[in-house]
Amino acid sequence: MSLDQRLQTTSLTIRADERVVLLGASGAGKTTLIKLCNGSLQPSRGALQWRGQPLKRLPRHERRSIGTFWQDLRLVEELSVIQNINSGALGRHGLIWALRNLLGVLEKDACLAVMQEVHLNPSLLKRAVTELSGGQRQRVALARLLRQSPELVLADEPLSALDPVIASDVLDTLLSLPGCLISLHRPDLIHRFERVLGLRNGALVLDAAPDMISKTQLEWLYGRS
């Protein structure tokens, strides 16, 4: 995978079944890398591939195997909880299904199942997302991701500004999925992952297992030495 001008050109391979954490100081290029991996940003050179195929040419049903947990959540404010959760399944259905989702309740049992997984009260099923607390909104976004059933999850700073209980639930849910690439400002959590990538000034400078990384390396990665 060749990256764009905000990152130094490199090659990086991530398996769909890996749990990878991405570390680096603010401005190191973490968000850019996440956006490149989900196709919302195109590289200025080279190409991104998923399962050996160019990412930008994949049909919708193939692209849904990559899910993104957005830092700003990207909930549809005009829709209810169940409608937002069901939007995670759009990649498996056509236009008629999408229109029916806008008009009423579809696949209620499937939605209740993922709500239970993220500890979201079922009484909120038909509630407008504008009426929810910040923590409840986080859980709706997580439930939507579970409805998508992705093979690889991308997440950019998903734990920022969360209280410890919600942050723990969010990370547990993301790590329960088949594979993930998650950017964090939490070096203390690297033991939860199989592989650590480190960016500094747009360059990939670290790629190792957590138990192979020293405190000195982490301090250098964040510009503290």
Map each language-model feature to its residues.
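ABC ATPase NBD coupling module
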Residues: Q53-W70, G104, I213
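Conserved beta-strand-loop-alpha-helix hinge in the C-terminal portion
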Residues: A203-S225
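Conserved ABC ATPase "signature" region
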Residues: A98-S123
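Conserved ABC ATPase signature
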Residues: A128-L132, Q136
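Catalytic Walker B motif of ABC-type/P-loop ATPase nucleotide-binding domains
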Residues: V153-E157
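Hydrophobic anchor residue at the start of the ABC signature
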Residues: L142
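Helix-to-loop junction immediately C-terminal to a conserved catalytic motif
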Residues: N38
